[in-house]
């Protein structure tokens, strides 16, 4: 079938594959592409030949960093597939992929079950209400345990799994699955080539009883969610397979339950049932319905868009990448209407006109040109100059802004110095392009040292970015040791602080008076907001046009905190009153007054230092448990829980990021290489007084 967008949206699925690093996500994706006829040769991650991993570093490191989008077909249905990274440093990639997906397949390792990263990605999918299927992969692995993995889905994710298949055998003897709907065995005995169809056989005698028990559980779980089915079930009437499937689809799309399948992608067993399930149970764009948006000029006015070609054009840019030949590629999910090459549209987030140069449907990093981009599909646009991740594109005559995406602040920074003058220029270009692609990559100039400081979500994240500067932009640079991204905040409210900015030199002077109040801001659950500004000025004592300048002045001053020059967060500023002068007042005067008022108020508000705390999970053999816990305590960490997992001990702790540099080597030497760990950013916490004094002294030289 030609790679063109299907007009019948009921036959379209926009899905992603999400998982913990090493759960076999990229291999699962590769198999899907092979089975749907896109790939003629199967790429393996450990050979560095995987199709979806198309950046040099991904091939080298055997991990997926960027989410490439691919279109493929299965039984006359079109699947637009987005590959997402499983490494914690790349959560922003996962977040922006989930934002534009209609459904996802969560891949779990049959031995490990739900791991910390799977849990984090699952919660991100909850945030965007993404319906999911579960695929328990690596059933051929030593220690694989399907039933344990299903239990971890219940215990750790609080989710309701619907077991659709039972494994036949495990580890080296994994040969197939029992299809609990059809009550047949799908067998792939021995070593099978990619694409091998299963033989359909009777259920092995030793599994018959278990299969009947699990089928009964499945039908009961499905029936209890529908009154009519429940009555028929208790009356002993037969419920047809089609009726069960229809209700499973309903439960899955509503996020009430999650169908669970199993197999081994690497050994080519269990892939076809997952493809069938994507079509049977995950939603099409019509099921998802209208997308919420608002009027760019007035956010109070709602503007919703239906997934139809007849509606005005609206789309969300969810990824920007630099292509070696075409330059800037913008990945876009089209929600309504359509657009053709050459059309003029508007970036309604930034209120800037854009022109569509070329349009492609992507197969990993190979492009298939198309003339039109239409509702319900994912495309790569070329020629968009001002569009970055999270921006809305819409019809110029009917602008709309779709919901924004939230991105976390960086937790780790490094100073980077170009080696030569020409590297200085190249570094500027590289930083600008990489920042366009990745909203969690930040750049700032350290005013004290004059160095360029780049920030990101972890050591691997920054390694990859620096590596890309060298490879793609030929920048030679010295990179400093990683620094923790500390923050400052206040603990005490300041009810009233008055500041007057006044300058009188020949001609017109400068005048602005502001009275502000400050208080600590407690961010709402799940919100990335760390600042709030409230205007309580009455009677025109400060003209309306100057109030945004006060706000801007306060925000500018928050970039450099009082204690050690770290950014200020979690502050609520209220502009109470002020005064102006007909001639001498200006936006600049009020901006300066806002900045100085904040600085003086913070000094009185009991400022403190904050540091990023990491949620660390360590898996260790029992005999090293004491060493591991002692080490966590010596790093100012606190152990929150301990549990058993497949013969090992799991220690969960909160540890300051500053104490985790070089931890991997220390852990290996303490446990003879038998323990491993993972960590994700948890929250910011106050630094103990004695440690804070050291940090401030080192930073300020006092």
Swiss-Prot record:
Assigned protein family: Belongs to the TRAFAC class translation factor GTPase superfamily. Classic translation factor GTPase family. EF-G/EF-2 subfamily.
Residue ranges of domain tr-type G in the record: 10-286
Subcellular location: Cytoplasm
Free-text function comment from the UniProt entry: Catalyzes the GTP-dependent ribosomal translocation step during translation elongation. During this step, the ribosome changes from the pre-translocational (PRE) to the post-translocational (POST) state as the newly formed A-site-bound peptidyl-tRNA and P-site-bound deacylated tRNA move to the P and E sites, respectively. Catalyzes the coordinated movement of the two tRNA molecules, the mRNA and conformational changes in the ribosome.
GO biological process terms on file: ribosome disassembly
A GO term for molecular function: GTPase activity
Short name of one Pfam family: EFG_C
A single cellular component GO annotation: cytoplasm
SUPFAM superfamilies: EF-G C-terminal domain-like (SSF54980), P-loop containing nucleoside triphosphate hydrolases (SSF52540), Ribosomal protein S5 domain 2-like (SSF54211), Translation proteins (SSF50447)
PROSITE patterns in the cross-refs: G_TR_1 (PS00301), G_TR_2 (PS51722)
Binding site for GTP: 19-26, 83-87, 137-140
Keywords: Cytoplasm, Elongation factor, GTP-binding, Nucleotide-binding, Protein biosynthesis
Name this protein carries in UniProt: Elongation factor G
């Amino acid at each position: 079938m030609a790679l063109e967008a299907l007009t019948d949206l009921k036959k379209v699925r926009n899905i992603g594959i999400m998982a913990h690093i090493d759960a076999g996500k990229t291999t699962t994706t590769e198999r899907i592409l092979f089975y749907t006829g896109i790939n003629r040769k199967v790429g393996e991650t450990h050979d560095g030949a995987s199709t979806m991993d198309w950046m040099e570093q991904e091939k080298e490191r055997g991990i997926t960093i960027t989410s490439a989008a691919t279109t493929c077909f299965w039984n006359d249905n079109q699947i637009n597939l987005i590959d997402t990274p499983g490494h914690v440093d790349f959560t922003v990639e996962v977040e922006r992929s989930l934002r534009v997906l209609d459904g996802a397949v969560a891949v779990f390792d049959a031995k490990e079950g739900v791991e910390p990263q799977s849990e984090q990605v699952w919660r991100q999918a909850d945030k965007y209400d993404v319906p999911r299927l579960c695929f328990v992969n690596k059933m051929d692995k030593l220690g694989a345990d399907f039933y344990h993995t299903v239990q971890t889905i219940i215990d750790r994710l609080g989710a309701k799994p619907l077991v659709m298949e039972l494994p036949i055998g495990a580890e080296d003897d994994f040969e197939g699955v029992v299809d609990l709907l059809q009550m047949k065995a799908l067998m792939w005995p021995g070593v099978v080539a990619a694409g091998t169809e299963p033989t359909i056989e009777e259920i092995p005698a030793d599994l018959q009883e278990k299969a009947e028990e699990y089928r009964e559980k499945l039908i009961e779980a499905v029936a209890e969610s529908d009154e009519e089915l429940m009555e028929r079930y208790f009356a002993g009437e037969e419920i047809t397979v089609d009726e069960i499937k229809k209700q499973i689809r309903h439960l899955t799309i509503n996020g009430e339950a999650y169908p669970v399948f199993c197999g081994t992608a690497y050994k080519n067993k269990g892939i076809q049932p997952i493809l069938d399930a994507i079509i049977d149970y995950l939603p099409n764009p019509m099921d998802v319905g209208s997308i919420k948006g608002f009027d760019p000029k007035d956010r109070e006015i709602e503007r919703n868009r239906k997934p139809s070609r007849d509606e005005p054009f609206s789309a969300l840019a969810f990824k920007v990448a630099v292509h070696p030949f075409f330059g800037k590629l913008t990945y876009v999910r089209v929600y309504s209407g359509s657009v053709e090459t050459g059309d003029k549209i508007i970036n309604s987030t930034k209120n800037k006109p854009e022109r569509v140069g070329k349009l492609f449907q992507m197969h990993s990093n190979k492009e298939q040109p198309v003339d039109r981009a239409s509702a319900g599909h994912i495309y790569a646009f070329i020629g968009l100059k001002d569009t970055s991740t999270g921006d809305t594109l819409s019809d110029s005559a009917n602008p709309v802004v779709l919901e924004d995406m939230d991105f976390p602040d960086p937790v780790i920074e490094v100073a980077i110095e170009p080696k030569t003058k020409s590297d200085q220029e190249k570094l500027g270009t590289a930083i600008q392009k990489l920042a366009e692609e990745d909203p969690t990559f930040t750049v700032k100039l350290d005013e004290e040292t004059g160095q360029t400081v780049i920030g990101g979500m972890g050591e691997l994240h920054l390694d990859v970015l620096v590596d890309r500067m060298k490879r793609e932009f030929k920048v030679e640079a010295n990179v400093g040791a990683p620094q923790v991204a500390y923050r400052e905040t206040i603990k005490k409210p300041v009810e009233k602080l008055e500041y007057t900015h006044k300058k009188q030199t020949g001609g017109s002077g400068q005048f602005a008076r502001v009275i502000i109040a400050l208080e600590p801001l407690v961010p709402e659950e799940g919100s990335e907001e760390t600042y709030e500004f409230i205007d309580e000025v009455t009677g025109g004592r400060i003209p309306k046009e100057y109030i945004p300048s006060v706000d801007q002045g306060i925000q500018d001053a928050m970039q450099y905190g009082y204690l050690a020059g770290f950014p200020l967060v979690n502050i609520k500023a209220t502009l109470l009153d002020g005064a102006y002068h007909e001639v001498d007042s200006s936006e600049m005067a009020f901006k300066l007054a806002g900045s100085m008022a904040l600085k003086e108020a913070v000094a009185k508000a009991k400022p403190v230092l904050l540091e990023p705390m990491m949620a660390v999970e360590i898996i260790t053999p029992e005999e090293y448990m004491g060493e591991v816990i002692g080490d966590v305590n010596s790093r100012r960490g606190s152990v929150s829980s301990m549990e058993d997992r497949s013969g090992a001990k799991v220690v969960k702790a909160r540890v300051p990021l500053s104490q985790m540099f070089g931890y991997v080597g220390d852990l290996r030497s303490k446990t003879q290489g038998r323990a491993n760990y993972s960590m994700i950013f948890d929250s910011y916490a106050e630094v103990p007084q004695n440690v804070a004094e050291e940090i401030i002294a080192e930073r300020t030289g006092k």
